[in-house]
Regions:
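Short, glycine/proline-biased beta-turn/loop segments that scaffold the active-site neighborhood
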Residues: 21-35, 121
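Short, surface-exposed loop or secondary-structure junction motifs
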Residues: 35-199
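Active-site SXXK
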Residues: 1-22, 97-101, 198
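N-terminal, well-ordered alpha-helical segments
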Residues: 7-12, 23, 27, 43, ...
Length: 199
């Protein structure tokens, strides 16, 4: 659900001419161009065709930091030429687009979320980075790992892909540090009503 909200921010910025679908991310985020990434466009990122489907060599908790994941992608080498193939960009989707939006506007992702999506739609209970409020934290559901997960991998037998979410994902997203961080692809927290109002 987070990716759709993030995409809404991007579409609104394109609508106003701040971003353009066929312009490289490096137009606004020059450091991203390193290692042959200078031709990856907003369209490639939105359509999971950027060639960067996963972070490499990043600590789990660092994935909750848009700055840390942005630096990780600046140093990354694409798995394929932009647009040549498609693979689900589970978490990198949010960093590619979130960091680009920040660079293009000079605003934080949380600010863009509030002013581009939430305020115009009258949404109060949705965050990318849960505020430090014990009452809010108490309302967040606890994630549980699949009961039939293989103890050696943490992956349920129904999933064929070894990169599928495992029991470590539940632990990661249950941590206060990750809930307080900004993960535009998967870390938004909100009520069902707030997400429904967006969609």
């Amino acid at each position: 659900m987070s990716k759709g909200v993030t995409a809404t921010i991007i579409h609104r910025l394109v609508e106003r001419g701040v971003l353009a679908y066929d312009e490289p991310l490096a137009t606004w985020w020059p450091a991203f161009a390193a290692h042959g990434k200078g031709n990856i466009t907003v369209r490639h990122a939105l359509s999971h065709r950027a060639g960067l489907p996963a972070f490499k060599d990043i600590a789990p908790m660092a994935q909750a930091s848009l700055a840390a994941t942005g630096e990780n992608l600046e140093n990354a080498i694409p798995d394929w030429a932009p647009g040549a193939s498609m693979s689900y960009h589970g978490l990198t989707f949010g960093t590619l687009l979130g960091r680009t939006a920040e660079a293009a506007t000079g605003r934080s992702f949380a600010h863009l979320l509030r002013h581009e999506v939430l305020d115009p739609a009258g949404i109060d209970d949705l965050w990318c980075g849960l505020p430090d409020d014990p009452k809010l934290h108490a309302r967040v559901a606890t994630l549980h790992a699949p009961r039939d997960a293989d103890p050696s991998t943490g992956i349920a037998p129904i999933t064929a892909d070894e990169r599928a979410q495992n029991s470590g994902v539940a632990r990661l997203f249950n941590s206060a540090e990750v809930r307080a961080g900004c993960m535009p692809a998967a870390g938004m927290i909100g009520t069902a009503r707030a997400f429904a109002r967006h969609y």
